[in-house]
UniProtKB/Swiss-Prot annotation:
Listed name of the protein: Polyribonucleotide nucleotidyltransferase
Protein residues bound to Mg(2+): D487, D493
Domain called S1 motif: residue spans: 623-691
Species for this entry: Afipia carboxidovorans (strain ATCC 49405 / DSM 1227 / KCTC 32145 / OM5) (Oligotropha carboxidovorans)
Protein's UniProt keywords contain Nucleotidyltransferase: yes
Domain of life: Bacteria
């Protein structure tokens, strides 16, 4: 019934198996990839006819994790998987980025790649397995895909690179880098690093590229057994059309792409486009070409003219040379009520970044296949349509916003203080108010400034820069701080973030083959120079974290209590802790290990809550004086609540210095008194004294008497 084919190899010390022909046989391509005991299924379906009226590849990639893969049932009311998690969105992008450039030019058939994690062994992260499975399914599908693509994760532990580290090995790593590419080229890099030098980052990229070569061979071997007949893609020859359009608007486009202001430039390009459309589509005459084809060629010519100008003159669209960074203005403290804020402007790109300090109650609970954990650093990136002078949708963040936010998160995360040193939940929000390239790196710069403005003690300020590359034959140009147009028209764009010490994040997308290790080395060196310049400009606003937290930020104090006292602080049904919170106004968070975090914007509120907690968890000391409340009056004395839930007896003989006939003559229930702990009687009952304490000042009268008698005795 099944015509199965499979290949197996040892990869990174674990078996990798790729199998097809048994599951999802109605898809154009389907592969089950097994790595250790992590199992991922990838399917590809592509429409048989092109989609009309579009000039792009209609490709959709969906990665999904099923909770049954980890032997769990989803939470929530409906008990089934819902909207994609952040990780699912990020892995979908990881799969999409290296495969998209490899589809044949002009392919316009709706294509959907669905990748599903079926089993997770808690050792091997499914993301790399998902990338391999998707590549294999595309290679088998008959879709015009110029792959296969391989992928690998690289860690750096004890000065050594590790291929596809397990989840346990990732705990100690200084680097988390994912690299993908073909046999001859690197296509994508995504990483987070602990301030590593550029040489190690590049070494990790080449290490990963070298070690996923066996996977490429395995996919090719499987394709030789089971690949479908490749689909025909008719390449459109546009040489004559291109020559005709050049004759009409070449000079117009060259002038347009020398206008530095984005909106003015777009207007000039639009006028050139209208001129072409008027030429090819006059009223009342049958057109010689399809409109979409003319516009496609026009767009290609835009790219060529920009590239020619840069390579021939060394000058860019806005007049800069290859290495110059646009003018920078950095400001902090721009919002009066925010805990920390910054406005970072670089040319026509601008980010308003705001930091908010929160408590343990604000931590984000993340439910993943590997288990539930709490995240104390959140970074959210918003890209409203007005930032590019357009109208558009406003609502929940899209994939691009989630991806850019995570890139900035990776750049900042390595320089944050340890949570036990700075026990706050941090939320950073970047509002992109203007955009003309590199808004994610503006977010990195603005986030660093806003965090320091809030008093968060970062290890070092962090900056980011977006780089571009244009390659034509043996000629190439590396561009620092690219514009939006240069991003679209170049062959490689990569973003590097870091401190003066080293790189914290590197993201790279390469659109063509032929980019060598030497070219990447030149690009990384130029990026470092640009980063240092940006750090210098940021230093004009702020060089380190402010010594004090913002006026409106909460204060957090941390104390440790014995774990067996946690129940006493919480009380039956939370009664005690609710009372502390209500009466002091402080927020209290208690961890299972006895760590207690007390937070409030009011220092007095924190001190009152801590005093209350200590009164519950500490043992009273003999000879110490305590504030108390009379809770019961008896003939023989009064019971006083003096140390949290603890009560003690003030015998009638200890109520006052003079003889007392009736207890009620001195105290009544509810009276606030000061008592001294005398000790325990034979039955273990607490003995207290009021007469040993000045009820007005709280002074220890016994100690005072002893001090006065001491000189007389001498």
């Amino acid at each position: 019934m099944f015509n199965t084919h499979s290949v197996e190899l040892d990869w990174g010390g674990r078996p990798l198996k790729l199998e097809t022909g048994k599951v999802a046989r109605q898809a154009d391509g389907a592969v089950i990839a097994t790595y250790g005991e992590t199992v991922v299924m990838a399917t590809v379906v592509s429409a048989k006819t092109p989609k009309e009226g579009i000039d792009f590849l209609p490709l959709t990639v969906n990665y999904q994790e099923k909770t049954y893969a980890a032997g769990r049932i989803p939470g929530g009311y409906f008990k089934r998987e819902g909207r994609p998690s952040e990780k699912e969105t990020l892995v979908s992008r990881l799969i999409d980025r290296p495969i998209r450039p490899l589809f044949a030019d002009g392919y316009r058939c709706d294509t959907q790649v669905i990748v599903t994690t079926l089993s997770h062994d808690m050792e091997n992260d499914p993301d790399i397995v998902a990338m391999v499975a998707a590549s294999a399914a595309l290679t088998l599908s008959g879709v015009p895909f110029m792959g296969p693509v391989g992928a690998a994760r690289v860690a750096f532990v004890n000065n050594e690179f590790i291929l596809n580290p397990t989840l346990d090995e990732m705990v100690d790593t200084q680097l988390d880098l994912v690299v993908a590419g073909t046999a001859t080229a690197v296509l994508m890099v995504e990483s987070e690093a602990k301030e590593l030098p550029e040489e190690i980052m590049l070494g990790a990229v080449m290490f990963g590229h070298k070690h996923f070569q066996p996977v490429l061979k395995a996919i090719i071997e499987l394709a030789e057994q089971a690949a479908k007949e490749p689909r025909d893609v008719v390449a459109t020859v546009n040489a004559d059309l291109e020559k005709e359009i050049l004759g009409i608007v070449e000079q117009d486009l060259r002038k347009a792409y020398s206008i530095p202001v984005k909106q003015d430039r777009y207007a000039a390009v639009g006028a050139a486009k209208d001129k072409v459309l008027e030429h090819f589509f006059p009223e009342g005459i049958e057109p010689r070409y399809e409109k979409l084809r003319v516009l496609d060629v026009f767009k290609d010519l835009e790219a060529k003219i920009v590239r020619w100008n840069i390579l021939d003159t060394g000058r860019r669209i806005d007049g800069r040379d290859l290495k110059t960074v646009r003018p920078i203005v950095a400001e902090v403290g721009v919002l009066p009520r925010a805990h920390g804020s910054a406005l970072f402007t670089r040319g026509e790109t601008q980010a308003l970044v705001v930091t908010t300090l929160g408590t343990g109650e604000d931590e984000q609970y993340i439910d993943s296949l590997a288990g539930t954990y709490k995240e104390t650093f959140l970074l959210h990136y918003n890209f409203p349509p007005f930032s590019v002078g357009e109208t558009g949708r406003i609502g929940s963040p899209g994939r691009r916003e989630i991806g850019h936010g995570k890139l900035a998160w990776r750049a900042i995360h390595p320089v944050l203080p340890a949570h036990h040193e700075f026990p706050y939940t941090l939320r950073v929000v970047s509002e992109i108010t203007e955009s003309n390239g590199s808004s994610s790196m503006a977010t990195v710069c603005g986030s660093s400034l806003a965090l320091m403005d809030a008093g968060v003690p970062l290890k070092r300020p962090t900056a980011g820069i977006a780089m571009g590359l244009i390659l034509e034959g043996d000629r190439f140009a590396v561009l620092s701080d690219i514009l939006g147009d240069e991003d679209h028209l170049g062959d490689m764009d990569f973003k590097v973030a870091g401190t003066e010490k080293g790189v914290t994040s590197l993201q790279m997308d390469i659109k063509i083959a032929g980019i060598t290790e030497e070219i990447m080395k030149v690009a990384l060196t130029q990026a470092k120079d640009g980063r240092m310049h940006i750090l210098g400009e940021m230093a004009k606003a702020l060089t380190a974290a402010r010594a004090e937290l913002g006026e409106h930020a909460p204060r957090i104090e941390v104390l440790q209590i014995p774990t067996d006292k946690i129940r006493d602080v919480i009380g039956t049904g939370g009664k005690v802790i609710r009372e502390i919170v209500e009466k002091t106004g402080a927020k209290i968070n208690i961890e299972d290990d006895g760590t207690v975090k007390v937070a409030s914007a009011n220092g007095e509120s924190i001190r009152a809550a801590i005093k209350w907690i200590k009164s519950i968890t500490s043992e009273p000391e003999v000879g110490q004086i305590y504030d108390g409340t009379v809770v019961k009056v008896m003939e023989f004395g009064a019971f006083v609540n003096f140390f949290g839930p603890k009560d003690g007896l003030v015998h009638i003989s200890q109520l006052a210095a003079s003889r007392v006939q009736k207890t009620s003559d001195v105290v009544k229930e509810g009276d606030k008194v000061k008592v001294k702990l005398l000790g325990l009687d034979d039955r273990g009952k607490v003995r207290l004294s009021m007469k040993a304490v000045d009820q007005t000042t709280g002074e220890d009268l016994e100690a005072k008497q002893k001090a006065e008698n001491a000189p007389a005795a001498e």
